[in-house]
Amino acid sequence: MLPSSIQPCSWILLLLLVNSSLLWKNVASFPMCAMRNGRCFMSFEDTFELAGSLSHNISIEVSELFNEFEKHYSNVSGLRDKSPMRCNTSFLPTPENKEQARLTHYAALLKSGAMILDAWESPLDDLVSELSTIKNVPDIIISKATDIKKKINAVRNGVNALMSTMLQNGDEEKKNPAWFLQSDNEDARIHSLYGMISCLDNDFKKVDIYLNVLKCYMLKIDNC
């Protein structure tokens, strides 16, 4: 059973602040909340519309970051080896594609998105920190990674707040895996960062799918 369609969504204010800081590039429009007694109220339908739009743009930006990193370090030996990459989220029981997501209950799908986002909280900090230590890394790559981290953090806060409001399940213990990048070998660190960005790219494609499937569910959109 879904909760009331109109709820106070304080996290929306955070996302709107993100937008005002020009972090919401390519989002043409977004719903505004209604103010009542100094509190922000927004329908869950509009909330998912907002989250779906933002997640899609982040997914595109992560793919761009991955392509730029791969192109810049294409001369590093073995960088593009197609051996299976084991990501920090590989153990999470989450839907692998859109078809599976469509068959997943909305509550479980929302939890899946939250699990992936939570699993990236510390690794995103490590990613931005380690990128700045690599020799000759372009400023644009560091800038994009920093920008993406801020946006993903906003989405994570929003999804967790939304999950708490919709599912009313309280805080659950989080077991977030670590990602170790320590190495004195420059090429080894580049390989690790490449794998890390590749995993982030794959994982955020999943988050994008989940939030947009949820948006279609909430808005009752067919053939989405």
Curated annotation (Swiss-Prot):
It comes from the Eukaryota. Residues 1-29 form the signal peptide. Glycans are attached at residues 19, 57, 75, 88. GO terms for molecular function: growth factor activity; hormone activity. N-glycosylated and sialylated. Keywords: Disulfide bond, Endoplasmic reticulum, Glycoprotein, Hormone, Secreted, Signal. It is found in: Secreted; Endoplasmic reticulum. InterPro entries: 4_helix_cytokine-like_core (IPR009079), Somatotropin/Prolactin (IPR001400), Somatotropin_CS (IPR018116). CDD domains: prolactin_like. The keyword DNA-binding does not apply. The keyword Secreted applies. Disulfide bonds join 33-40, 87-199, 216-224. GO terms for biological process: hematopoietic stem cell proliferation; positive regulation of hematopoietic stem cell proliferation. Expressed in placenta and hair follicles, with highest expression levels detected in the outer root sheath and no expression detected in bulb. Expressed in placenta, skin wounds, keratinocytes and weakly in embryonic fibroblasts. Expressed in brain, cerebellum and in Neuro-2a cell line. Not detected in liver, kidney, ovary, pituitary gland and brain. Its main location: secreted. GO terms for cellular component: endoplasmic reticulum; extracellular space. May have a role in embryonic development. It is likely to provide a growth stimulus to target cells in maternal and fetal tissues during the development of the embryo at mid-gestation. May play a role during wound healing and in the hair follicle cycle as a growth factor and/or an angiogenesis factor. May play a role in microvilli formation and cell proliferation of neuroblastoma cells. Belongs to the somatotropin/prolactin family. This is Prolactin-2C3. The lineage of its organism: Eukaryota, Metazoa, Chordata, Craniata, Vertebrata.
